[in-house]
Amino acid sequence: MSKKRLHEIAKEIGKSSKEVVEHAKYLGLDVKSHASSVEEADAKKIISSFSKASKPDVTASQTVKPKEVAQPSVTVVKETGSEHVEKTQVSKPKSRNFKAEREARAKEQAARKQANGSSHRSQERRGGYRQPNNHQTNEQGDKRITHRSQGDTNDKRIERKASNVSPRHDNHQLVGDRNRSFAKENHKNGRFTNQKKQGRQEPQSKSPKIDFKARAAALKAEQNAEYSRQSETRFRAQQEAKRLAELARQEAKEAALKAQAEEMSHREAALKSIEEAETKLKSSNISAKSTADNRRKKQARPEKNRELTHHSQEGQKKNKKSWNSQNQVRNQKNSNWNKNKKTKKGKNAKNTNTAPKPVTERKFHELPKEFEYTEGMTVAEIAKRIKREPAEIVKKLFMMGVMATQNQSLDGDTIELLMVDYGIEAKAKVEVDDADIERFFEDENYLNPENIVERAPVVTIMGHVDHGKTTLLDTLRNSRVATGEAGGITQHIGAYQIEEAGKKITFLDTPGHAAFTSMRARGASVTDITILIVAADDGVMPQTIEAINHSKAAGVPIIVAINKIDKPGANPERVIAELAEYGIISTAWGGECEFVEISAKFNKNIDELLETVLLVAEVEELKADPTVRAIGTVIEARLDKGKGAIATLLVQQGTLHVQDPIVVGNTFGRVRAMVNDLGRRVKSAEPSTPVSITGLNETPMAGDHFAVYADEKAARAAGEERSKRALLKQRQNTQRVSLDNLFDTLKAGEIKTVNVIIKADVQGSVEALAASLVKIEVEGVRVNVVHSAVGAINESDVTLAEASNAVIIGFNVRPTPQARQQADTDDVEIRLHSIIYKVIEEVEEAMKGKLDPVYQEKILGEAIIRETFKVSKVGTIGGFMVINGKVTRDSSVRVIRDSVVIFDGKLASLKHYKDDVKEVGNAQEGGLMIENFNDLKVDDTIEAYIMEEIVRK
């Protein structure tokens, strides 16, 4: 059966824990505090006892009548001729003269007694309340009246009745000793009279009902007012006591200082007298010494150093040194030591005679209304926060059933339960991770709605290889960037900004090759509008479909630009029909996508395309807050030999300034310089503006988010923390050998690997190369990218390649002279490329050559042994004749006897007559010897063969 704590029961029924504990003790339950547990049946008993106490039944109402209490602060209005009682009105409590009220009530009751002529004792006193009792007769009331003069006996009787009262009135008995003392005092002052209140002389059945709830509310209000007055009085008394204690401390301090000064004067006088006595003693000692020396000189014989010997003594001490003078010096030292000792005693006496410092009283601190806690706080920390002693909290925890010391950590539930016991609202502290950059992008409160302004749209151009993406962007920028691209492929994302009709548009150019899937996905994630360019003569291609999927995943609108309409084989209608199969439906067909037919080469309909972009941007309502600290995304990153790490950033919110402390991905730094898309230095960059910055300590990854921090210290801490987390995550991803994956590990050991080190000019090319090489499928071989980074090939790359037996692949970079010299010395291969599919083809060939060769057996010829010759120290020589094919010197041979192979090995020698030959042809004779085999016999068949490697296709 489950148990409940008393404070939980009190919370359920709306009572205080103290009342619930008293009820439980009265019912005979073994409880100690509000944290004690009881069975569920006992809990029901406690709850039922409260319901009985608050709503008495018919029997109780017949046996005991509650006695009205004079309540000057409560006004009860009754209707004439009805038993309805109006709602009580509680006035503001005022200070009362209880003694005067008691005397007035006694006089009023005496007057009523004389007016009525007969008195009936109908009320008894219980805990300060008058209760009607139908079991008491008028005769008993008269007896009580006659015994009222016996003060001591009546007092004892009242206490006895208060202790033996019926259990149906437990709610009144819980008032305690305070109400019993009121009962004694009220009895002595004549409050126990046998008169009923005015209007109560009619029979009980006709008496109006008593509104117990109103009385209880009035009594509660009176008790609260009294408690507030007592609290105020107690507070003032404490303040007065503190003031008096402070005065007493000041007086004691002054008295101690005065006593100390007097003691110092006495000590100085004593020291002066001691010094005078010592000087007198010294002078007397010196005079005595001089007289003794003179006497000794007269008596002694003239001898050298005679004052230091004793000739008058007998035995061992004769003719020995006399230490009288030294003893005198010692005595003098001892006297000085005693003087210092007395002085020290005097100092100690000063400390002991000073008045003891008064014990300072502990200041009373109010409990806080709220308490913000963190998981794992210790008892000492909680005590310091709420300004309480740790021992007090340890005691409370012990009463709650929790054994803890002041240095022990507590969980959140225990802290909340402890704060509930103190009456404090507990709240868990929300930890803010300063190293989390993503929270700036997700927090809606980061932007100020009052400062929101319209921003330029970010447009990404996507499409298949050589469909005219870079040519279109080149036409927009009036430059010829496209002609310089290697192999007709854009190698990395370029971000550019143009102005049309007074409004700015930011363009992102993405590569179209299959290797740059991640770069296209990154471009779609930061864009607002996608321009899908499709060649009118080629139609929909694989990368076109991929671009459609990226745009749909990013949830951005698509504008289709049908390019190359100037070519003879252009068919725009076919392109529209093919795109409709993938959900890209033109507005002319009832869809949502805008289609524009252009010719990027001849600058045809380009203005119409830009107008369409601005129209879609206006519909999207693109907004930004330029007043907050800047956040955005890394478009590209590279390592420059002279400038260090360079990152191309796209500002999405806020304004980026020079010298701003910034965290980019897992690195940090301060913006040293900013360059826009035209190569000009700028001091700030507003939302939707692409800029290249320097000043980072490391090269970030393309696609990382960046955020500006308040100061460099916070940025450094966040960057270092993010770097540690990335390193820890990388270590966790490293698989270790266990019994579960042991078989997979052994199986993986059978697969050959080609180790490569990739160095490229930009981070996007590094990612594309690594992804493409890993995807190469050659059975039994896989590519292992040992290291990849941006920048030139240096000596450390060559050292790593030598240690890991790897090939260095440089993409649009060159090795340093020192690295090239070291590579020649260490025999490390360096391959340099500028077109990505050439790299893929070369690595694929290397992977095929890495496999173990597959050999096929090829029979060269057969021979028959005609004669055998045994030569000592040489072995058996077999004379043979070739019957088919030929026998070569480097071939392997099998010895077949009776169609059974009895030996397989290599030839030791092959001769034609006496000459060593490389081969013996068909129908020719010769002699041979076989390595490690001498059991040749006549008519044995010799089969010659070689193992030939099969070329992989």
Curated annotation (Swiss-Prot):
Keywords: Cytoplasm, GTP-binding, Initiation factor, Nucleotide-binding, Protein biosynthesis. InterPro entries: EF-G-like_DII, IF2_II, IF2_N, P-loop_NTPase, Small_GTP-bd, T_Tr_GTP-bd_dom, TF_IF2_bacterial-like, TIF_IF2. GTP binds at residues 463-470, 509-513, 563-566. This is Translation initiation factor IF-2. One of its GO terms (cellular component) is cytosol. Residues 488-492 are annotated as: G2. PANTHER family: TR-TYPE G DOMAIN-CONTAINING PROTEIN (PTHR43381:SF5), TRANSLATION INITIATION FACTOR IF-2-RELATED (PTHR43381). It is found in: Cytoplasm. Its main location: cytoplasm. Residues 191-207, 282-291 have a biased composition (Polar residues). The gene is infB. Residues 322-338 have a biased composition (Low complexity). Residues 463-470 are annotated as: G1. Residues 509-512 are annotated as: G3. One of the essential components for the initiation of protein synthesis. Protects formylmethionyl-tRNA from spontaneous hydrolysis and promotes its binding to the 30S ribosomal subunits. Also involved in the hydrolysis of GTP during the formation of the 70S ribosomal complex. CDD domains: IF2_eIF5B, IF2_mtIF2_II, mtIF2_IVc.
